[in-house]
UniProtKB/Swiss-Prot annotation:
Temperature dependence: Optimum temperature is 70 degrees Celsius.
Assembly and binders: Homodimer.
UniProt keyword terms in alphabetical order: Glycosyltransferase, Transferase
Cystines in this chain: none
Protein name in the entry: Beta-ribofuranosylphenol 5'-phosphate synthase
Amino acid sequence: MLRLRTPSRIHITLIDLNGSIGRVDGGVGLALEEPHIEIKAKESETFVLKGEPINRERFEIAAAKMAEYCGRGAEIEVVSDYDAHVGLGSGTQISLAVGRAFSELYGLNLTTRQIAEIMGRGGTSGIGVAVFDHGGLVVDGGHSTKEKKSFLPSSASRAKPAPMIARLDFPDWNVVLAIPDLKGFFGEREVNLFQKSCPVPLEDVREICHLILMKMLPAVVEADLDEFGKALKRIQELGFKKAEVEQYGELIKGCFDLADCIGMSSTGPTVYAITDSNAGGIERSLRDYFAEKGYECRTIVTKARNRGVEIEV
């Protein structure tokens, strides 16, 4: 019996949805300890899914793609998974976990990038693929416009996974997740968001790059939460991240005053705050904020995960 445990991830921002330099996308993201995907797997001629997964269809689709690739099945027991379309990257982690399970069981020796290509993941953001292997804070380098000629989300892009260009261990800060019970942007809604918001202004892209290279990454190395928070808050006001936040009207933007280091993950609706103190107070404030707006809100206090997938035989 094989056991795999993967991180979740925050997607902090896409970097360049202007594309005039000859590359598009790029991104920054962070691996988290919780929530997580955990599965057990063993050889089987047919596909058998056990447990009570939230994302049954995603597991079935991933297994079908691997069965088509290698001609074998597997018995997979889902020990833990988490909601899709909330901005925490469950789709990529499920796909990669199932793919790695098949690779390990049948000696396929597939790299994570190869599995991602089989699964059709990582066509816009390379963050999920990178944190699966490495954990930590990751920057990916996007795609050449020779390969990807339009602005599309990963779910609608057939480009290869973006290359990882930087990876740092993240400090031992608390990460507070607030997951309000409202519909995120995925499928056709997400495609439409890209089409109506892109290309973003080049000056926004340049400022995002400046913030990442000269404020955010040094702040991680120096464990300077104040500077990290300043970069993070400004990024919420720029480029495609601004467009993502604005899809929720004033709802998401309105909670950004509740912490000094706060943002929205991916297309939302998950909001995250990073703190070295008072995690409980921030958690309560976020929960109360969404309750006052009429939304139930699940919260999780976790930490960054500075390692990737765990595999036990």
